Amino acid sequence: MVDAPAPAKSPNLEIQDFRGNFDEVSELIQSSWAENAQKPLLYSPEFLASCFEYPGASFRLAPTIYTGNKPVAFIAGFPRTVRYRGRDLRIIVASFLSVSVGQKNKGYGVLLWNELVGRARAAGYDGMVNYCVDGEAMNGIILGCCRMLKLATARFYSTPYQMRLLTQKRASEAHSGRKEEREQDALENFLEGVRPIVDETPLARVWSREEAAWQLKRYGSIVAQHSAGSRRGIVTGYLMEIANAQRTRCLLIEDLLWGTLAAPERETLLHQFLDRGISAGAQMAIVPVLNYADLAPLRAARFRSSPRLVHGYLTIFSGEPLPEEVPAAYLDIF
């Protein structure tokens, strides 16, 4: 087993559990990522706080380097269960790795990533997933760290994206039934919709009821469901701003759960979802193409290829089952 590196010994610099100071970490992420070639999303304090409300999330899995009371480097791992090669694995998805501009090139990012690996292994996790935008230096850094720690790692999927601009219009929505009934119906619809995806997709996220409930109510959540007789489906996503001068409001599509809907009904569901996003102020929509869902409704809705490409790296701490490339995946990217 690879031991996590010891915390830094300087009295002014040490690795600690994240303290929950979301305002400062939000500023750290934005300033650190501002140098990236592609404009990042604006990870607000409220969005970050909602990520840690996910069942099982812990400040322990968010090692942070503080100088006094100020965070200068940060990373977080969020728990997920995935079914891969017939086994349910508990993994973490590593995200938000950031180092303050004045502290870069000192090895803090590698130090924190290694620390997160050690903490995840000590907590009994089976592996981890890292995402890197195509062309960014992090691709080489992640693979280099995995080789250094002798971790079985493979690029399991490279995710292209599709997007479309959204035209502001008045969208009429009719809601029948009480709010509590709609929420319960959405939860059952969601869990029913993911079941065949988990069975048919080589690497797929497995949801508990509590996790699915979080997904439907997460910060900025947009959800639409549609039924036609006994057929039904649901689409989920959330609203974020892009960290550009215009603060473009972007609707990120997460779960395309067409369920048992027929082709025209899937298009209806997608239009309902986009209308809800427009009503919430969305100016564009973007969706990762993971090949677990029918893409015909996206083509009908005039989605087009985006230049964005994100590589996913799967690490299995024990080496079994061996991580390898898959033709389709169902797992969130952030």
Feature annotation, model-predicted:
Residues 2-7, 128-177, 234-334:
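Active-site/acyl-donor-binding loops of N-acyltransferases
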Residues 94, 99, 105-118, 263-275:
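Conserved acetyl-CoA-binding loop-helix of GNAT-fold acetyltransferases
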Residues 102-134, 138-143:
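Membrane-interface helix-loop-helix junctions at boundaries between adjacent transmembrane segments
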Residues 60, 122-125, 221, 279-282:
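Short, high-confidence coil segments that cap the C-terminus of an alpha-helix
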